[in-house]
Amino acid sequence: MKRIAFVFSTTPHGSASGREGLDALLATSALTEETGVFFIGDGVFQILSGQTPDVVLARDYIATFKLLGLYDIEQCWLCAASLRERGLETGASFIVDATPLEPEALRGELDNYDVILRF
């Protein structure tokens, strides 16, 4: 079975990309257990807690990321450099238990996947 990586690299409420990626991730998890999730660049905002999307009239799909554990999706990583660049390395609270990795280590993890889908 192919290993599939989902890379979230966009902000959560600027487009439908994050929501569509999450839908694809949950659907794919029914077909394979070899799934990894990566949050890089602005994608680190996808799982930042305390967001209020209703202020910009957006749907709060962020809470759906909490379901990853129920779908047995446990391989989640954050880009440590992206966190630093956005001032999120200390005190930030995330709704998913994701492991921060430096870019080189993150690339090493991504190399373990056969298919990479970017949202």
Curated annotation (Swiss-Prot):
Keywords from the UniProt entry: Cytoplasm, tRNA processing
Compartments reported by the entry: Cytoplasm
Matches recorded under Pfam families: DsrE
InterPro entries, alphabetized: DsrEFH-like (IPR027396), Sulphur_relay_DsrE/F-like (IPR003787), Sulphur_relay_TusC (IPR037450), Sulphur_relay_TusC/DsrF (IPR017462)
Keyword hit for tRNA processing: yes
Annotated signal sequence range: none
Cellular component GO terms held in the UniProt record: cytoplasm
GO biological process, one term: tRNA processing
Keyword 4Fe-4S applies: no
Family membership noted in the UniProt record: Belongs to the DsrF/TusC family.
Function: Part of a sulfur-relay system required for 2-thiolation of 5-methylaminomethyl-2-thiouridine (mnm(5)s(2)U) at tRNA wobble positions.
HAMAP family: Thiourid_synth_C
Subunit structure: Heterohexamer, formed by a dimer of trimers. The hexameric TusBCD complex contains 2 copies each of TusB, TusC and TusD. The TusBCD complex interacts with TusE.
Name of the featured protein: Protein TusC
Native source organism of the sequence: Citrobacter koseri (strain ATCC BAA-895 / CDC 4225-83 / SGSC4696)
